[in-house]
Amino acid sequence: MLVVGRSPINRVVVAKIVERSGLKTISEAPDTAMAMLRIMAPGTIILDGGSDNKDCDGLMQSILSLRLASGSNLPSVILLSNRAGTPESLSLSSAVDIVVAKPITPERLQPVVEKLLGRC
């Protein structure tokens, strides 16, 4: 699983929550995540949208390209947002599957990760 965000602290917090589900995580800043997407094809990506949900906009086209190449909806994309809603109601890229509102806690994020993994 790839965790992307500008804040190193948020990346660590999110990675620790995800690791509770038994997943290995790689954490990257938005500017270095592009290179990581070329190296690996993660099944799930968690993006921290920042204050305006735009911190990771530069990755959206690459994510959509990965989906096109795989012929599926993988990688799944979770956006961590300051606003609650659906990707559609927040006018987000079609690359975003699920929005999780901040503050990020294990009680909010872990069930979403488990659902994507098909464990719920």
Where are these regions (language model features)?
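Two-component/phosphorelay signaling modules centered on CheY-like receiver
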Residues: 8-26
